[in-house]
């Protein structure tokens, strides 16, 4: 319990008025003062759940399945104080994502009985927990547009996508309100995890409610109404979207969804979520939404609504000023040469559902499904930077290895634990009784952690400086 957690009296009174009668107010307050259980989600782009459980079976980790996400687990660790979860080898290799359990629920709702994943939009995506969860379902097929308004969070979003092996993403940096006009009827599936007042996050941060007020709720709800309208306009007819928040008041949740229904009438259908997982009915509202109070599942507070679009709706007319697209698509013959060189050098195969583009001396891999959106939306970053072209050939990039390598390549060098720690600290490796030449895929316990190059009797470290960890790394 954390008795110092700040809970405004006005907030308590508001919850008392809206919380279902069968739920206890005392349990709600006690839950708000109880620290949140940590949770992770296995990244199935890199490893299966079964293989992950085998891999961590020698650790002092107690993993409890999250009922609404078959790749999610609550985690308890004995060594949390000596090594942070983010500095474990498995995390740095992208084998799992640290994600609050409740935040896995919107993507579960998005994906259930939904295979329309050719063109997907995550409208407010940073830092990337739900984006990478969606990417796991897509298995790098189709195109995943990940939008983020805050410029400072784009870099973190990209780093997380790269670490997790996502190569079908295209990043945009806009207010989400532009999508309805710029890209109407463009996306099969949309997640709008809307910016909110964060009432459900009180268990993570005792001061989360320090700036909370009823008036601020109304200001935020106005933004959310604009966002949900834009998302619905950008959704294809027949498509499906999920609206979610990590807050509890009605203004930012039910009322926003009702506003959408009032605006577009029968074009909007709320699909009930009572059978989303065993026990989901405990948080079900009369509209079929999930309104998750923290004491129900011992989790963060959350709201999830699943919405189907049955008819096209009016969209704003906009004048686009895109500028010249700075990339040129590579002809099939040249793409084949690049693919051959990548295979010959690193034993990596280019994905079939992708295009190769160039910008000056840079070589990039874009998802093929991105083509219809080029010229319609301005992108901040797309796909994966494969290489830089030099006189002697291609200099392959770290992100190419992290997204495309499997660890089973002929040129893979598997490091011992002490060597792996040195690698993550940005140092070169000197393998004993081993010599080679050229570039190599560097692995730890058979999973890629970067690209290196033989220089004499050492492997030169190719880890980007921003990914170097200096202290508090995993135990050997």
UniProtKB/Swiss-Prot annotation:
Family recorded in the similarity comment: Belongs to the class I-like SAM-binding methyltransferase superfamily. RsmB/NOP family.
Classification via PANTHER family: 28S RRNA (CYTOSINE(4447)-C(5))-METHYLTRANSFERASE-RELATED (PTHR22807:SF30), NOP2 YEAST -RELATED NOL1/NOP2/FMU SUN DOMAIN-CONTAINING (PTHR22807)
HAMAP family: 16SrRNA_methyltr_F (MF_01579)
InterPro entries documented for this protein: Methyltr_RsmF_N, MeTrfase_RsmB-F_NOP2_cat, MeTrfase_RsmB-F_NOP2_dom, Nol1_Nop2_Fmu_2, Nop2p, RCMT, rRNA_ssu_MeTfrase_F, SAM-dependent_MTases_sf
GO molecular function: RNA binding; rRNA (cytosine-C5-)-methyltransferase activity
GO biological process: rRNA base methylation
Role noted for this protein: Specifically methylates the cytosine at position 1407 (m5C1407) of 16S rRNA.
Nuclease keyword on record: no
Cellular localisation: Cytoplasm
Name this polypeptide is given: Ribosomal RNA small subunit methyltransferase F
Pfam families: Methyltr_RsmB-F, Methyltr_RsmF_N, Methyltranf_PUA, YebU_pre-PUA_dom
Organism: Photobacterium profundum (strain SS9)
Top-level taxon: Bacteria
Gene that this sequence comes from: rsmF
Protein residues bound to S-adenosyl-L-methionine: 124-130, 148, 175, 193
Enzyme type, top EC level: transferase
Predominant subcellular localization, coarse grouping: cytoplasm
Catalytic activity: cytidine(1407) in 16S rRNA + S-adenosyl-L-methionine = 5-methylcytidine(1407) in 16S rRNA + S-adenosyl-L-homocysteine + H(+)
Active site: residue positions: 246
EC number of the protein: 2.1.1.178
Keywords in alphabetical order: Cytoplasm, Methyltransferase, RNA-binding, rRNA processing, S-adenosyl-L-methionine, Transferase
Any GO CC annotation of this UniProt entry: cytoplasm
């Amino acid at each position: 319990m954390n008795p110092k957690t700040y809970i405004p009296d006005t907030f308590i009174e508001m919850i008392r008025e809206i919380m279902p009668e069968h739920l206890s107010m005392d349990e709600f307050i006690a839950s708000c003062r109880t620290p949140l259980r940590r949770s992770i989600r296995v990244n199935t782009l890199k490893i299966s759940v079964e293989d992950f459980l085998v891999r961590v079976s020698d650790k002092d980790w107690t993993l409890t399945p999250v009922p609404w996400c078959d790749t999610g687990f609550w985690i308890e660790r004995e060594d949390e104080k000596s090594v942070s979860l983010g500095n474990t080898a498995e995390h740095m290799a992208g084998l799992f994502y640290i994600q609050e359990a409740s935040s896995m629920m919107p993507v579960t709702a998005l994906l259930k009985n939904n295979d329309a994943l050719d063109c997907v939009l995550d409208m407010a995506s940073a830092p990337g927990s739900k984006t990478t969860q969606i990417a796991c379902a897509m298995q790098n097929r189709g195109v995943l547009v990940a939008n983020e308004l805050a410029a400072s969070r784009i870099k973190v979003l990209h780093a997380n996508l790269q670490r997790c092996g996502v190569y079908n993403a295209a990043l945009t940096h806009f207010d989400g309100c532009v999508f309805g006009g710029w890209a109407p009827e463009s996306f099969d599936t949309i997640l709008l995890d809307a910016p909110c007042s964060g009432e459900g996050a009180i268990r993570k941060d005792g001061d989360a409610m320090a700036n909370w007020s009823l008036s601020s709720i109304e200001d935020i709800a106005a933004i959310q109404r604009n966002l949900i309208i834009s998302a619905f306009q950008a959704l294809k007819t027949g498509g499906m979207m999920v609206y979610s928040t990590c807050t509890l008041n009605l203004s930012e949740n039910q009322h926003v969804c009702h506003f959408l229904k009032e605006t577009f009438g029968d074009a909007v259908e709320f699909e009930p979520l009572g059978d989303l997982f065993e026990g989901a009915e405990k948080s079900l509202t009369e509209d079929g939404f999930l309104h998750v109070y923290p004491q129900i599942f011992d989790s963060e507070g959350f709201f999830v609504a699943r919405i189907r679009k049955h008819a096209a709706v009016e969209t704003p007319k906009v004048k686009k000023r895109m500028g010249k697209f700075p990339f040129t698509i590579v002809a099939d013959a040249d793409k084949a040469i690049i693919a051959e060189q990548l295979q010959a050098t690193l034993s990596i195969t280019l994905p079939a559902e992708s295009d190769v583009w160039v910008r000056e001396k840079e070589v990039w891999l874009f998802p093929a499904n991105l083509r219809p959106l080029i010229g319609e939306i301005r992108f901040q970053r797309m796909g994966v930077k494969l290489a830089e072209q030099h006189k002697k050939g291609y200099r392959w990039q770290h992100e190419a290895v992290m997204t495309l390598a499997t660890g089973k390549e002929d040129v893979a060098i598997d490091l011992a634990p002490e060597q792996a720690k040195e690698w993550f600290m940005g140092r070169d490796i000197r393998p004993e009784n081993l010599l080679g030449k050229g570039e190599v895929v560097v692995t730890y316990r058979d999973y890629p952690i970067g690209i290196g190059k033989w220089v004499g009797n050492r492997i030169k470290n190719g880890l980007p400086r921003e990914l170097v960890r200096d202290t508090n790394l995993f135990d050997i």
